[in-house]
């Protein structure tokens, strides 16, 4: 809450990024605690790949409507239609294309700070990122240009065209997130809990069969009891085998896990050892 208030106080036009996932659902609850009974001092924005799980989009729209806040949607499909980026094709992921849609929206609306739900335990690139992460006029992240953060002293000063990414959940872990969800009774999309789903095993991951993910000639779809540890583009987000249908059961699973949710279930992080850092240098979340 302190970090959100700090960003709202120091920055002229911040925005809260909301994907409909568990981390951004926690961010919304923290924003409620920080600013209610007034309205949020920033709009809510989703960078939509167009390949999202329907349950997540339904939850996104319902949750924002319940809050009575403004929702902006930065569309990857629009970036493709206008020639800003190339369509990766039927088997490609649009996850990396979110960078262009995000930066275009930041420029369009004049945002100087974007509040996101990234955590340091997710990936080694995020582990070395500041709570207030400085981005240059091109939206790019340079680890060598990050500002020192001593105690709870944060600098939100930027020049015109520059911006910040703010990560209030930086020091939280996946276990912290789920414990907070349980304590606060935070609603989540149903795909976070165990359910029957048709999946395809590909490259060691269980991808949900969908309009964008179909079995290849040497593959077959099978119905399994699974849940998702993280949500993203359906073409690169894998499920895990699970029987956990309650928050308490998920907490027990997470406590035994030794691999982060991104490391275990995100194909877009497997392109190279520096996949996340490369994307951040381009302007990713």
Residue ranges and their predicted role:
Residues 1-285:
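Nucleotide-activated chemistry modules centered on ATP-dependent adenylation/adenylyltransferase
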């Amino acid at each position: 809450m302190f970090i959100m208030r700090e960003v709202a106080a120091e920055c002229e036009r911040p925005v809260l990024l909301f994907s409909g996932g568990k981390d951004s659902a926690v961010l919304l609850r923290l924003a409620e605690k920080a600013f209610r009974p007034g309205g949020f001092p920033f709009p809510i924005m989703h960078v939509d790949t167009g390949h999202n799980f329907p349950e997540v989009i339904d939850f996104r729209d319902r949750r924002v409507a319940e809050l009575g806040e403004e929702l902006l949607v930065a569309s990857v499909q629009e970036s493709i239609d206008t020639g800003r980026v190339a369509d990766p094709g039927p088997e490609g992921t649009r996850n990396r294309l979110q960078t262009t849609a995000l930066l275009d929206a930041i420029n369009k609306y004049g945002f100087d700070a974007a509040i996101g739900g990234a955590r340091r335990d997710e990936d080694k690139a995020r582990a070395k990122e500041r709570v207030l992460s400085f981005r240059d006029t091109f939206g790019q992240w340079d680890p060598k240009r990050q500002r020192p953060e001593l105690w709870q002293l944060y600098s939100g000063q930027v020049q015109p065209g520059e911006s910040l990414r703010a990560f209030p959940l930086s020091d939280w872990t996946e276990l912290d997130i789920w414990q907070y969800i349980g304590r606060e009774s935070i609603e989540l999309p149903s795909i976070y809990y165990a359910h029957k789903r048709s999946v395809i095993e590909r490259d060691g991951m269980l991808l949900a069969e969908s309009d964008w993910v179909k079995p290849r000639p040497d593959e077959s779809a099978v119905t399994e009891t699974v849940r998702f540890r993280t949500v993203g583009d359906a073409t690169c987000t894998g499920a895990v085998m699970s029987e956990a249908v309650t928050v308490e059961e998920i907490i027990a699973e997470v406590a035994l896990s030794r691999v982060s949710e991104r490391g275990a279930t995100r194909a877009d992080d497997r392109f190279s050892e520096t996949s996340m850092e490369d994307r951040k240098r381009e302007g990713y979340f």
